[in-house]
Amino acid sequence: MAMTDPLGDMLTRIRNGQQAKKDSVLTPASTLRVRVLDVLQREGYIRGYSEEALGAKGQHKGIRIELKYFEGQPAIRHVARVSKPGRRVYSGSKELPIVRNGLGITIVSTPRGVLSDAEAREQNVGGEVLAEVF
């Protein structure tokens, strides 16, 4: 069966992995997923990620995401998909949502790449609001 929301699937794997206290989770690779992981790593929500070969012959690519914890608690307390395949959400740079009074981030896909809300405001660009994390 085809996956309708690959980014939502990755965010769910991260959420489930942290609830189960896993060190890392594995997800299929895609360019968008890598760009979102770059933002999460820059903002300090994950330790890092690496690309791996999957399958018996290594014909598929996967991403191993190294989860981060602080004093035994997950670094990501909440992660939610905002723009979904059935309902896209777009925002200008001035209207980007502020998550938890600035304690969290919004991940935005812009013409300049996938950025956090702070980076998008700084560069004065808007775009599709992909997810919110805190």
Swiss-Prot record:
Similarity comment: Belongs to the universal ribosomal protein uS8 family.
Free-text function comment from the UniProt entry: One of the primary rRNA binding proteins, it binds directly to 16S rRNA central domain where it helps coordinate assembly of the platform of the 30S subunit.
Protein name, per record: Small ribosomal subunit protein uS8
GO CC terms of this entry: ribonucleoprotein complex; ribosome
PANTHER family: 40S RIBOSOMAL PROTEIN S15A
UniProt feature coiled coil, ranges: none
Alphabetical list of PROSITE patterns matching this protein: RIBOSOMAL_S8
SUPFAM superfamilies, sorted: Ribosomal protein S8
Gene, per the UniProt record: rpsH
GO biological-process terms attached to the record: translation
Keyword annotations: Ribonucleoprotein, Ribosomal protein, RNA-binding, rRNA-binding
HAMAP family: Ribosomal_uS8_B (MF_01302_B)
Assembly with partners or alone: Part of the 30S ribosomal subunit. Contacts proteins S5 and S12.
Record's keyword annotation contains RNA-binding: yes
Domain of life: Bacteria
Single annotated GO MF: structural constituent of ribosome
Classification via InterPro entries: Ribosomal_uS8, Ribosomal_uS8_CS, Ribosomal_uS8_sf
Lineage of source species: Bacteria, Pseudomonadati, Pseudomonadota, Alphaproteobacteria, Sphingomonadales
